[in-house]
């Protein structure tokens, strides 16, 4: 022990002898720079040096004011002495940090450098072998004292993400030697994260297919459950990644997967597995252009049946009654959606329809449309052309036969005669046009002792047809010439006189038949009325025509002819409109029992109003059906609200069997029903973007209309988007009161007989005992809001009508649509309370929607709107369907934070502080130095009592500031809410300090 200092002194003696002055300067400079105690014994007024992180940071510069005459010798002393200085190393780090996403974390590394070291660079931070640049993550603090300087580099990460996982460590250079700290492993844990979700596919019926789902932690492992139509497919979980093999489906289904780990569960998006079917028939078949022998047709393909269209066929048949009904079929590719039909007859009528096919089969044909070809030039020349010379008049007589009617391709307007005269040294070509009235012409002789060549062509408005074969005749100087032979003899027509005579006799026979039939009809009329009126009496008859009748008795007789009740007659007697004032147009839409037609209603001032006419489709309708049809009109008679469709009148006409048939006249709605409008905006070839403010306005319009009806004690009982109409100004009107009822006593109506009802819009109590109240309409209004938000989607996809009651009874409700605000979903969800008394009134709903609309910004373009897709209730990250989490929490007194900076410290003291705001927190594991800190004490849960709605506070989940209950969102077979674990969803900060 005594020899060691002596040997060390002998080794240092040469260096001290040669560089004593420089060494003294070095010690003086360091004493001045790092004067004061170490952090373990810092004075009260001591303040450390702080500097942001930089890979080029140097130690603080020495203080000025002292001279150092031996400055030039310092490098030699340092270079010689550095080989004998003790090694410098970083203190032990925390080692391993485990925390949840979105928390704040801080950690550090520290080092003690004696005054004997002079060439020291700053501390740099590295992650996974790459240097972290930038000064916003770390701060370096210096603590100088008499013996040296202690350096602490702090590193912080705000709201950690999974990308922050990795190994962090410090680096610095001391006397050109690189020193590396122990690594600090940061592990960010959270709910499972999907890296591959199931994808929607279109499959053939009863054909197997696969779905893949893959999610990762940490923490691992991640288990996968598959869900089909809200029911689990596999009872035992599968390790991620998981591949589900479905043997085959017969109907459309919705699949999703649940990823579970120790932090909770995450639910993937639901994907639709569609069954391929035959396509729908094409629509909007139009004629783009037509010529004499071709027609250009276009169409819009129908729904492809979840399989690409392969080709289409155009079916063409003649529309003339005399045609044989044969159909010509032209096949073409599915795209482009147009085809030119050729080889058609000119000036003919055709019926055209289109059908398309996919891999499953052919669609039904589209509705037949009528098309016509235009007039064309004749396709053949006139026949039987003869030419002879009339020598007395010095003219040529030319005769011919008209082309066949089917080959004329139009209406003949005349003929063009071309005659060429040739003689020795003379050539003359002339042409003349004659009318179509005759089939002969005369032309003067132009040249004698010459040859004349004659050709004739027929003319229509479509053009000039081909010329006939030439007919030559020789014109002598003074001699008689017989007529030239026929140029184009008609086959089978050797004698045209017989044909003309036959046609003449036929016309005479037809005329005789018409005369006889008229005489017989007149005789029958005279026999029918007999001699009731003599010629003298008939002069005393006054003929008049009533312009309009206001006789109440006449109206009663008209309504009585329908056989309806007297009460209904009294309700409708003042709204019956004369049939002559109504002009019907095209059919706008058809249902199972009726149709809606476009019409024009003449007003008293001579103008006309465009209206919609609702008729009964069937001719063999029963008396009860007529009563129900007119009862709907009676319901609307007294309505006067801008958001409720009003009745314009009732009209009666005779059906094809001579039976009176009622028609209800309503205002014309330009945009049709709301459901079709929303559906086309989402599924059309060019989707129309609808602002959220517009959707809210639709809901407010319906709420105002239903508020008006409920205040008048009317139950609609069939409120849905399909029964709401859109006016020209985009105002929604509540319509279709076929199931409406007036409540005269009490506040409910019980349905007596069984009728067709919209099951997916009916409240749960109405499904159970067929009792309807205004709160039943509130339930349907919530479903209608869901339809509007999803832009026309069908409620409860994958759930059959006969399953609806059990589905609702187990607490299931419509899920929150994508891009739906939480506040909006709150409003619609309140409409589906199991207890009707807990549902809001339409007045409250209107006020809530108006308040929500006022809080939203003005409508913007689609590109500038950002939607935040919140998680669905069933997949909320606050629910964990797995084993209980281990109650290991790091809960250390913040006053015990100690920075161990003394160079002689044998063990680095590691302390951690975790700020907790939630009693239910996940586990933290922190390893520091040679000690492992574990606080196994868990905070007990406070006693809770049910709230006023019977739901315990722990059964509620706060998401985006809104409280949700699990009772109405858990799938069938799930554990009770008391068995569910709540995964931490807070954003409280947590920091770990060395």
From Swiss-Prot:
Entry-annotated residues carrying Phosphoserine: 538
Bilayer topology term: Single-pass type I membrane protein
Domain Fibronectin type-III intervals: 281-376, 381-478
Effect of deleting the gene: knockout mice are fertile, but male animals that lack all three receptors TYRO3, AXL and MERTK produce no mature sperm.
Glycosylated residue positions: 91, 108, 165, 202, 210, 229, 289, 311, 324, 331, 349, 384, 390, 437, 449
Reaction catalyzed: L-tyrosyl-[protein] + ATP = O-phospho-L-tyrosyl-[protein] + ADP + H(+)
Residues holding ATP: 588-596, 610
Annotated GO MF terms: ATP binding; transmembrane receptor protein tyrosine kinase activity
InterPro entries named among the record's database cross-references: FN3_dom, FN3_sf, Ig-like_dom, Ig-like_dom_sf, Ig-like_fold, Ig_sub, Immunoglobulin_dom, Kinase-like_dom_sf
Disulfide bond annotation, renumbered to this chain: 109-170, 213-257
Parts of the chain that traverse the membrane: 498-518
Keywords: ATP-binding, Cell membrane, Disulfide bond, Glycoprotein, Immunoglobulin domain, Kinase, Membrane, Nucleotide-binding, Phosphoprotein, Proto-oncogene, Receptor, Repeat, Signal, Transferase, Transmembrane, Transmembrane helix, Tyrosine-protein kinase
Active site, renumbered: 718
Domain Protein kinase: 582-852
Residues spanning the signal sequence: 1-18
Entry-linked SMART domains: FN3, IG, TyrKc
Tissue occurrence: Expressed predominantly in the hematopoietic lineages: macrophages, NK cells, NKT cells, dendritic cells and platelets.
Highest taxon listed in the record's lineage: Eukaryota
Gene Ontology cellular component list: cytoplasm; extracellular space; photoreceptor outer segment; plasma membrane
GO terms of biological process kind: apoptotic cell clearance; establishment of localization in cell; lymphocyte activation; natural killer cell differentiation; negative regulation of cytokine production; negative regulation of leukocyte apoptotic process; negative regulation of lymphocyte activation; neutrophil clearance
Location of the region described as Disordered in the Swiss-Prot/TrEMBL record: 44-78
Description of how the protein assembles with itself and partners: Interacts (upon activation) with TNK2; stimulates TNK2 autophosphorylation. Interacts (via N-terminus) with extracellular ligands LGALS3, TUB, TULP1 and GAS6. Interacts with VAV1 in a phosphotyrosine-independent manner. Interacts with TIMD4; this interaction enhances TIMD4-mediated efferocytosis.
Function of the molecule: Receptor tyrosine kinase that transduces signals from the extracellular matrix into the cytoplasm by binding to several ligands including LGALS3, TUB, TULP1 or GAS6. Regulates many physiological processes including cell survival, migration, differentiation, and phagocytosis of apoptotic cells (efferocytosis). Ligand binding at the cell surface induces autophosphorylation of MERTK on its intracellular domain that provides docking sites for downstream signaling molecules. Following activation by ligand, interacts with GRB2 or PLCG2 and induces phosphorylation of MAPK1, MAPK2, FAK/PTK2 or RAC1.
The protein's name in its UniProt record: Tyrosine-protein kinase Mer
Origin species: Mus musculus
């Amino acid at each position: 022990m005594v020899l060691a200092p002596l040997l060390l002194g002998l080794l240092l003696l040469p260096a001290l002898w040669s560089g004593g002055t420089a060494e003294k300067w070095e010690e003086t400079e360091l004493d001045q720079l790092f004067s004061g105690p170490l952090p373990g014994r810092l004075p009260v007024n001591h303040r450390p040096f702080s500097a942001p992180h930089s890979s080029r940071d140097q130690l603080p510069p020495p203080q000025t004011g002292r001279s150092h005459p031996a400055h030039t010798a310092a490098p030699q002393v340092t270079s010689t002495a550095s080989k004998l200085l003790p090694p410098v190393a970083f203190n032990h780090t925390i080692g391993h940090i485990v925390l949840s996403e979105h928390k704040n974390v801080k950690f550090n590394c520290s080092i003690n450098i004696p005054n004997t070291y002079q060439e020291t660079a700053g501390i740099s931070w590295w992650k996974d072998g790459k240097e972290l640049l930038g000064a916003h993550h770390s701060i370096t603090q210096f603590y100088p004292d008499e013996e040296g300087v202690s350096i602490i580099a702090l590193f912080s990460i705000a709201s950690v993400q999974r990308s922050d996982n990795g190994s962090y460590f410090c680096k610095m250079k001391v006397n050109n030697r690189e020193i590396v700290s122990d690594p600090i492993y940061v592990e960010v844990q959270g709910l499972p994260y999907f890296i591959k979700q199931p994808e929607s596919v279109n499959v053939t019926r009863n054909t197997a297919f696969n779905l893949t789902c893959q999610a990762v932690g940490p923490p691992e492992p991640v288990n996968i459950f598959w869900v089909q139509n809200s029911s689990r497919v596999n009872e035992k979980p599968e390790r991620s990644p998981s591949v589900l093999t479905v043997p085959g489906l017969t109907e459309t289904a919705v699949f999703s997967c649940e990823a579970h780990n120790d932090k909770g569960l995450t639910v993937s998006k639901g994907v639709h597995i569609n069954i391929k079917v035959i396509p729908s028939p094409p629509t909007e078949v139009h004629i783009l252009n037509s010529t004499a022998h071709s027609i250009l047709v276009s169409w819009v393909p129908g729904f492809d049946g979840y399989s690409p269209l392969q080709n289409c066929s155009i079916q063409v048949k003649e529309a003339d009654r005399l045609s044989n009904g044969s159909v010509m079929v032209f096949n073409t590719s599915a795209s482009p959606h147009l085809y030119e039909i050729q080889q058609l007859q000119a000036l003919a009528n055709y019926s055209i329809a289109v059908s398309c096919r996919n891999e499953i089969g052919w669609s039904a044909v589209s509705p037949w449309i009528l098309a016509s070809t235009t007039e064309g030039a004749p396709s053949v020349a006139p026949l039987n052309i003869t030419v002879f010379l009339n020598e007395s008049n010095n003219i040529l007589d030319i005769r011919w036969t008209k082309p066949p009617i089917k080959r004329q391709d139009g209406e003949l307007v005349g003929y063009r005669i071309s005659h060429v005269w040739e003689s020795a040294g003379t050539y003359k070509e002339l042409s003349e046009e004659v009318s179509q009235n005759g089939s002969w012409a005369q032309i003067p002789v132009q040249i004698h002792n010459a040859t004349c060549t004659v050709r004739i062509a027929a003319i229509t408005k479509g053009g000039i047809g081909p010329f006939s074969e030439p007919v030559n005749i020789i014109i002598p100087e003074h001699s008689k010439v017989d007529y030239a032979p026929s140029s184009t003899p008609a086959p089978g027509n050797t004698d045209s006189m017989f044909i003309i005579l036959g046609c003449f006799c036929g016309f005479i026979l037809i005329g005789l038949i018409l005369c006889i039939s008229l005489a017989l009809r007149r005789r029958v009329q005279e026999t029918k009325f007999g001699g009731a009126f003599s010629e003298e009496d008939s002069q005393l008859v006054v003929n008049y025509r009533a312009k309009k009748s206001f006789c109440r008795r006449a109206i009663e007789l008209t309504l009585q002819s329908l056989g309806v009740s007297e009460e209904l007659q009294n309700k409708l007697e003042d709204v019956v409109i004369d049939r002559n004032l109504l002009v019907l147009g095209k059919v706008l839409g058809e249902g199972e029992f009726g149709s809606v037609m476009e019409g024009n209603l003449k007003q008293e001032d001579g103008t006309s109003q465009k209206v919609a006419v609702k008729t009964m489709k069937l001719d063999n309708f029963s008396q009860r059906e007529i009563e129900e049809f007119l009862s709907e009109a009676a319901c609307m008679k007294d309505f006067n609200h801008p958001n409720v469709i009003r009745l314009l009148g009732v009209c009666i006409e005779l059906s094809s069997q001579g039976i009176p048939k009622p028609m209800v006249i309503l205002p014309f709605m330009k945009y049709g029903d709301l459901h079709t409008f929303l559906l086309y905006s989402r599924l059309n070839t060019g989707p129309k973007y609808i602002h959220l403010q517009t959707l809210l306005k639709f809901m407010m319009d319906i709420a105002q209309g239903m508020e008006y009806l409920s205040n008048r004690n009317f139950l609609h009982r069939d409120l849905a988007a399909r029964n709401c109409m859109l006016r020209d100004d985009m105002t929604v009107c509540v319509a279709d009161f076929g199931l409406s009822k007036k409540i005269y006593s009490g506040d409910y109506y019980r349905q007596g007989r069984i009728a067709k009802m919209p099951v997916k819009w009916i409240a749960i109590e109405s499904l159970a005992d067929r009792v309807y109240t205004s709160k039943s309409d509130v339930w349907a209004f919530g479903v209608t809001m869901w339809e509007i938000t999803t832009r026309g989607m069908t409620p409860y996809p994958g759930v059959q009508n006969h399953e609806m009651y059990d589905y609702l009874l187990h607490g299931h409700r419509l899920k929150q649509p994508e891009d739906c605000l939480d506040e909006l979903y709150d409003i619609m969800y309140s409409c589906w309370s199991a207890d009707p008394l807990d549902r809001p009134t339409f007045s409250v709903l209107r006020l809530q929607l108006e308040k929500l609309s006022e809080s939203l910004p003005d409508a913007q373009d689609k590109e500038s709107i950002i939607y935040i897709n919140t998680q669905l209730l069933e997949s909320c990250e606050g629910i964990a369907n797995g084993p209980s989490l281990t109650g290991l929490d790091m809960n250390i007194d913040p006053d015990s934070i100690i920075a161990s900076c003394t160079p002689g410290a044998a063990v680095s003291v590691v302390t951690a502080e975790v700020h907790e705001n939630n009693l239910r927190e996940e586990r933290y594991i922190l390893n520091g130095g040679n000690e492992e800190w574990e606080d196994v004490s868990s905070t007990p849960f406070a006693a809770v009592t049910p709230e006023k709605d019977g739901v315990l506070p722990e059964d509620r989940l706060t998401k985006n500031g809104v409280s949700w209950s699990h009772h109405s969102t858990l799938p069938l077979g799930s554990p009770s809410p008391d068995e569910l674990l709540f995964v931490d969803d807070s954003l409280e900060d947590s920091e770990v300090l060395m």
